């Protein structure tokens, strides 16, 4: 039996032996849906790190650059559809094997695939909120507002980047008009957790509560370089739970894993979860 088949057989056994899985997914789970990831096989940045919270809140130039790239990128991101990995994990949940699926992604593709008990750890890109009055709204109308205010930018074409961004280089972002909150005139931000921003406590508590009842942990498409997700794997290891990972390249928790399959998530899960 070759190593590939051996890994798949071992993963089938791992999943078959669990009744209360805690699943943690990252960007690699959505790459087959056409959404790029941030890191290479060594866990290093493939491109410039994303904007951080302080920069976004601290100045109009940073917000103009962010929203220009996001407006152009949303056309691609908003059309992404679940891939075989999302559908396989949804099947596991529908069978009652998944206590909670915690995703670091903001694309809502697990829900689109029919996933149950999904926790969007870092929020969701299909909603926006005001940082002053907490007004909230769907991304569709906000996208329309952005495009009406910036018709010349709306016609631009650019390559897709992670998390709904677009690769726009050499542009004069000072000419991009950033709309304000329709209720109070405040700063509008996507309802996602930026770098430098804290994950809401209730989400973290819900994840830890599910982990206490889990009998195994499955990591899908995450290098675990971000502490926001890595901490749950650390806690699982301390509790003696078996941990498996499907990920191309190294993870921060390689020394904690009972099993690792270094192949694309969609291919592996399509074969293992019938």
Swiss-Prot record:
GO cellular component: cytoplasm
Binding site for Zn(2+): 130, 133, 181, 184
Superkingdom field: Bacteria
Sequence ranges assigned to domain Deacetylase sirtuin-type in this UniProt record: 1-274
UniProt-listed Enzyme Commission number(s): 2.3.1.286
GO molecular function: histone deacetylase activity, NAD-dependent; NAD+ binding; zinc ion binding
Function description: NAD-dependent protein deacetylase which modulates the activities of several enzymes which are inactive in their acetylated form.
Name of protein: NAD-dependent protein deacetylase
Organism of origin: Bordetella bronchiseptica (strain ATCC BAA-588 / NCTC 13252 / RB50)
């Amino acid at each position: 039996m070759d190593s590939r088949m051996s890994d798949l057989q071992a993963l089938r056994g791992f999943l078959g032996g669990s009744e209360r899985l805690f699943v943690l997914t990252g960007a690699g789970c959505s790459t087959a849906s056409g959404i790029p990831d941030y890191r290479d096989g060594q866990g290093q940045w493939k491109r410039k790190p994303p904007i951080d919270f302080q920069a976004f809140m601290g100045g109009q130039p940073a917000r103009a650059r962010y929203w220009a790239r996001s407006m152009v990128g949303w056309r691609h991101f908003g059309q992404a559809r679940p891939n075989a990995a999302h559908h396989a994990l949804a099947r596991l949940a529908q069978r009652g094997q998944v206590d909670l699926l915690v995703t670091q992604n903001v694309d809502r593709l697990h829900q689109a695939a029919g996933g149950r008990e999904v926790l969007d750890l870092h929020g969701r890109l299909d909603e926006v909120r005001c940082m002053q009055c907490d007004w909230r709204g769907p991304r569709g109308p906000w996208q329309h507002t952005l495009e009406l205010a910036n018709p010349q930018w709306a016609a631009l074409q650019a390559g897709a980047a992670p998390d709904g961004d677009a690769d726009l280089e050499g542009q004069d972002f000072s000419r991009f008009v950033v709309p304000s909150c329709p209720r109070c005139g405040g700063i509008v931000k996507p309802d996602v957790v930026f770098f430098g921003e804290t994950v809401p406590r209730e989400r973290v508590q819900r994840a830890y509560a599910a982990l206490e009842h889990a009998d195994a942990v499955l990591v899908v498409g995450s290098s675990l370089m971000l502490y926001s997700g890595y901490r749950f794997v650390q806690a699982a290891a301390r509790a003696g739970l078996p941990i498996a990972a499907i990920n191309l390249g190294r993870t921060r928790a390689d020394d904690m894993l009972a099993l690792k399959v270094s192949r694309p998530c969609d291919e592996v899960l399509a074969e293992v979860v019938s």
